[in-house]
UniProtKB/Swiss-Prot annotation:
Comp. bias intervals (Acidic residues): 214-223
GO molecular function, one term: actin filament binding
InterPro entries: FH2_Formin, FH2_Formin_sf, Formin-like_plant
UniProt biased composition (Pro residues): 396-407
Protein name: Formin-like protein 9
Gene designation per UniProt: FH9
Similarity section: Belongs to the formin-like family. Class-I subfamily.
Length: 782
């Protein structure tokens, strides 16, 4: 790589443009130079390639820094002393200007240098990526190593770690670089002091191929024997060099049966040398695959918490297990010599490694939780911290006793704050006024209170069950009417007997007419002798039924109350129709407009079968004039007619007269909203109402009605009949005159009234035509 950068540097030196001083005069070249050209130029240091980390390491290595750009060397210019004013330089008579032709070689040289540098960087990056890809594929191919090599490799690591003295024990990530420790010629900057997570767990040895599918079931069945700590870290591989024989964690002996050992590696503020991880081992790859396939979600979550939250938990790694459940204990702590499957063992380790913020809490609980030892099923413990002579013989410890039960603390754990809050218990409660009163201070008579202030209400059980006769909707309407009614039931019955419609009013009479019961309901109401057996609505109707022909009286009084208003409405409608007929016949401007339309139609029909000699046309043609468009596509035949009228009558006068048609024919528009059939039905209904009153009087006389109330009712009804008969005669005369006027207008504009099915249709045609004509006049005026 150094040769590659040296070649680039030499090429840049050869491509550098000549100095502008070479073109200067001889006088300028005679100046004293402060730089020796013969001195060798400082060669650029070759970039130190970062150590290669295999893919099997737990944390991915940071991306390698880009190669430093080689410093661009330019031609060296002569330097001058600081006191340049003291120099006596020869001056020429004419100033020397640099030729513009010298700029082109300089610029081209700069561009060539930039192009060469970019091309070199691109080729170097591409070569580096291809090399990394080849190394990754080579590392992945090493995963297929044999099982025997793995056994020997792990056993060798265990023996090397067991023979080391406590002083020679190294922890993971604590070894320094060889270059720094041996005092190399140059200083290598150390990496960021971050804690790297350990490699994954080694696999449990099985000769079967379906290990990954069966190991989950066995772990669930024997969950008490094997427990993976949430804060577990994974043992590192052995060092590649003999000088680094002490690994960061003691690798246990791997056997077909499951066994494990626990080691600790406290966080180190420095990174370990990268050479510890340069030699990939197949067991690492297999352990990583096994850990990713069978690891529980809780283990991943606690490991993530330990690595990212910065709590500094000790890393506990389970490396191997033995059939006898042997354990390997480090000299740093005896708490982590065993992994208990119970939650209190996990909580004990969590308290021991807790940050300072939990010291108050852990100080109270640690004394209780530390009394728990390893499970009673553990047989022996091996201490690595002892001398090498003692490590050869491992004494078997007696089984520990059962841990004592947890004793709850006498006081609850409360985090004391600096600011003391005042509780309600500190202040004595105030004695209220009501607490000072005595129960025997005053005596009240319960009987007197009930007698004076409590209404006499019978027991709900003693109340009779009310029978519901009417329809629920009808009963609700009657109840609403009684609430809005200002009269009592007796007053209503008296007004019906007297025939006084002014007392009741038209609205009340209309409501009573709608509440008329059926014959079956009327029979049931009359069957109840006592009103307490029925509801208020039924009781009201029962009182009304005592009046003879009560609902016929209600209909008669309602007709009397509405008679005068109906007659007035009929008179107005008939008068409007008659005035509309007169307006159509006597309107001069409307006649001129119809004549202009007739002439225009005859002119357009000259060369047709009709020969243009029509004398009249139906008013339906007025609505079709606006649909006949001219060649311009905008003006219609009605526009042409209005324009011709403006020429003959004068533009201003004709336009104002046409616009005034809406005012002259205002009653025509009102008549278009009136239905002649409705007018005739109203007249017939009034006549039928008079006949119903006469029939009621006859029924009352035949039933033997007598008394002052009957006489009053008969007298009022007889007087009304006389007045109503006179009004009916007048209305009928007005109706006949209106009908004759309609026939005359229809014959005048349509020719034959008998062929017209709709009597009032002529008014609707004129109303629609006037609206279209008004729009045309506005367009013509604009």
């Amino acid at each position: 790589m150094q040769n590659f950068w040296f070649a680039i540097f030499f090429f840049l030196l050869t491509c550098a443009p000549p100095s502008p001083l070479s073109y200067a005069s001889t006088v300028t070249l005679s100046r004293r130079l402060l730089y020796d050209y013969e001195s060798p130029l400082p060669l650029p240091l070759s970039p130190i390639s970062p150590p290669f980390f295999p893919l099997e390491s737990s944390p991915p290595s940071p991306p390698p820094p880009l190669p430093p750009t080689p410093p661009t060397t330019f031609a060296v210019f002569p330097t001058f002393p600081a006191n340049i004013s003291a120099l006596v330089l020869p001056r020429s008579s004419k100033p020397h200007h640099t030729s513009p032709t010298l700029l082109l070689p300089a610029l081209s040289a700069v561009l060539v240098i930039a192009t060469v540098i970019g091309l070199a960087l691109f080729l170097y990056g591409r070569h580096r990526g291809q090399t990394r890809h080849l190394k990754n594929s080579h590392c992945s191919s090493s995963n297929t190593s044999s099982y025997g090599d793995e056994q020997s490799h792990i056993t060798t690591n265990f023996n090397m770690a067991a023979t080391t003295s406590p002083s020679e024990v190294f922890y993971l990530n604590t070894e320094e670089s060889d270059h720094i420790r041996t005092g190399g010629t140059f200083f290598l900057k150390q990496d960021s002091p971050e804690i790297r997570p350990l490699p994954p767990l080694p696999p449990r040895s099985f000769h079967h191929n379906n290990y990954e599918t069966e190991v989950n079931e066995e772990d669930e069945e024997e969950e008490e024997d094997v427990f993976f700590s949430p804060m577990a870290s994974l043992p590192g591989s052995a060092n590649s060099s003999p000088s680094h024989s002490c690994s960061s964690s003691c690798s246990g002996w791997v056997s077909p049966a499951r066994s494990f050992s626990i080691t600790m590696s406290p966080p180190n503020p420095r990174y370990s040398d990268a050479t510890n991880l340069q030699s990939p081992s197949p067991e690492r790859l297999r352990v990583r695959k096994n850990y990713n396939g069978n690891g529980s979600s809780s283990l991943r979550m606690f490991s993530f918490w330990n690595q990212n939250m910065g709590f500094g938990f000790p890393r506990i790694s389970s490396a191997s297990t033995s059939p006898d459940r042997g354990f390997i204990r480090t000299p740093l702590s005896s708490l982590y010599s065993s992994v208990s499957t119970s939650p209190d063992g996990l909580f004990r380790k969590f308290l021991d490694s807790s940050p300072p913020i939990w010291n108050d809490f852990s100080r109270n609980v640690k004394s209780v939780l530390l009394s728990h030892t390893a499970s009673s099923r553990r047989d022996f413990v091996i201490n690595i911290g002892e001398s090498s002579s003692q490590q050869s013989k491992v004494p078997a410890l007696p089984p520990p006793t059962r841990p004592p039960p947890l004793v709850p603390p006498s006081q609850p754990f409360v985090v004391q704050n600096d600011v003391k809050k005042q509780s309600f218990s500190d202040q004595p409660p105030k004695q209220l006024h009501w607490e000072r009163l005595r129960s025997s201070s005053s005596k009240l008579s319960k009987e007197m209170v009930e007698t004076m202030f409590i209404a006499n209400s019978s027991n709900p059980r003693d109340l009779p069950i009310q029978n519901q006769v009417l329809d629920p909707r009808k009963a609700q309407n009657i109840a609403t009417l009684l609430q809005l009614l200002n009269l009592s039931t007796k007053d209503v019955c008296q007004a019906l007997l007297d025939g006084d419609c002014d007392v009741l009013g038209a609205e009340l009479l209309e409501c009573l007419s709608r509440l008329a019961p059926s014959k079956e309901e009327e029979r049931k109401l009359k069957s109840f002798s006592d009103g307490s057996e029925i509801g208020p609505a039924e009781r009201f109707l029962k009182e009304l039924l005592h009046v003879p022909f009560v609902f016929k009286r209600v209909d008669a009084l309602l007709f009397v109350a509405n008679f005068h208003s109906e007659i007035k409405r009929l008179r107005k409608s008939f008068s409007v129709v008659q005035v509309a007929c007169e307006e159509l016949r006597n309107s001069r401007m409307f006649s001129i407009l119809l004549e202009a339309i007739l002439k225009t139609g005859n002119m357009m029909s000259v060369r047709t079968n009709r020969c243009g000699d029509a004398d009249a046309f139906k008013l339906d043609t007025l609505l079709k004039l606006v649909d006949v468009k001219g060649l311009d596509g905008r003006s219609s035949l009605l526009h042409f007619v209005v324009q011709e009228m403006m020429k003959s009558e004068g533009s201003v006068r004709a336009l104002e007269g046409i616009r005034n048609l809406n005012t002259e024919l205002s009653n025509v528009k009102k008549s278009a909203d009136i239905e002649y059939g409705v007018l005739r039905s109203n007249v017939s209904r009034i006549c039928q109402g008079l006949k119903n009153i006469e029939a009621l009087l006859l029924l009352s006389e035949e039933s033997g009605s007598y008394g002052d109330q009957w006489l009053k009712f008969k007298e009022r009804m007889t007087r009304f009949l006389k007045t109503a008969a006179e009004e009916i005669v007048k209305i009928k005369i007005r109706e006949s005159s209106t009908l004759s006027a309609l026939e005359e207008v229809t014959e005048q504009f349509h020719g034959d009234a008998s062929k017209e099915g709709h009597t009032m249709r002529i008014f609707m045609i004129v109303r629609d035509f006037l609206s279209v004509l008004d729009q045309v006049c506005k367009e013509m005026g604009d």
